[in-house]
Amino acid sequence: MRVRFAIATLALALTTGCATGLNSVQKAELDHYEARGMAVQEKNPGLGAGLGLLPGGGSFYGREYGFGVVNLLLWPLSIFWDPVSGYEASRSINYQATRTHIERQRKKALDELDAKLAGNEIDLKEYTLQRRQVEERYTAY
């Protein structure tokens, strides 16, 4: 009975212990923004991975508190998956922060452009040209 419980607990921990992470499109988008210097780094992925060696550290750092408690209880076994969890969670947090920042910047630029058009500071042709430039600046592809 104890062996079954231990195997079930280990299987549960191994299947749920890691953060889901980003899909390939999100990774490409974040890499694009990082290359252009537009990414926001709220969490350091290297630090998240390093803290994963401590009991539950990677999960707690990545704001996965439930998994952090489980990994704390399963330490030292959790050092096999918690560094990956901390790294992936940090990247996910950075992706969300970057998306929010980029969208705010884009909206601000478009609002300023709309105000110029409404105030007759620019004509429709100039508005269209500048709007296209704003869209290109804040689009990942």
Where do the model's predicted regions map?
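Alpha-helical transmembrane segments of integral membrane proteins
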Residues: 4-8, 43, 47-51, 66-70
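Residues within alpha-helical transmembrane segments of multi-pass membrane proteins, especially transporters
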Residues: 13-15, 54, 58, 84
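Hydrophobic alpha-helical segments, especially transmembrane helices
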Residues: 3-5, 60, 132
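Sec-dependent bacterial lipoprotein signal peptides
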Residues: 1-20
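Membrane interfacial helix-start motif at the N-side
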Residues: 34-43, 54-67
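Transmembrane helix recognition focused on a "late"/terminal membrane span
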Residues: 18-48, 71-141
